């Protein structure tokens, strides 16, 4: 290589090196804005004391020059928690330089304090980004719901008999075993945690109405994808198992206006006695979106109709 070519090559490499060492130009132009993947986040029903899943969004700088984010603030209370690119202390979210064309991760979750009311509670807050004498906002909203938690020990909760009311929803964490009669009032909602099941060894009376149906579903209230809520995703909980305990009288099962959704098994009724069979009435009900079986009947006198 000739001396001239070496000088030219060295000059090019030197220019590249100097350019790479230059600091990003931080613009204070108030017309430059950040771009958000979402301008608001809505959390579907969040159970009080339990907390939500974590939602993610992106903060972009679509401009050529860097932008200095002076500080980030939460405008409202303390029901929402944020993590900005690994920093979860809001007081430390200041003097953040976001290079041109670069982005930041923002994670948001919420935990709602228990309320004295049983109906859903609406809460909201705002994340405020201050930059270049301007501000930009992301709106946060959530519905909180008080629930009655049914949780046992070693994964089981056993009851002699059980009456579930519609005063507030139930969150069933473990396998619920009812050795006597089980009744579920119209308008009741049962949220089943992952792996939770119901075993009923006595009579089961679950009579909803068209105005106040009974709902038995998984406890995920967020979304699998933006257009697909978790409530329709199968395999979220175990199933409902009706077992004949071989008592003097065969058990009686009544389900009317009941929606059973998103389990591994919907309704499984089993008897070993082919002579003294339990009776099942299943009317005006929906059993759908289950991973294995929707309805299984063995030695059951059944009336299934809509």
Residue ranges of model-derived segments:
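Short acidic/proline- and small/hydrophobic-mixed sequence motifs that coincide with surface turns
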Residues: 52-53, 64-69
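Bacterial N-terminal signal peptides that target proteins for export
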Residues: 1-8
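Short, solvent-exposed loop/linker segments at beta-strand-coil boundaries, enriched for Pro/Gly
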Residues: 73-92
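Asparagine-centered strand-capping/turn motif at beta-strand->loop junctions
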Residues: 59-63
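Beta-strand/loop edge motif enriched in small/polar residues
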Residues: 25-27, 34-45, 50-52, 56, ...
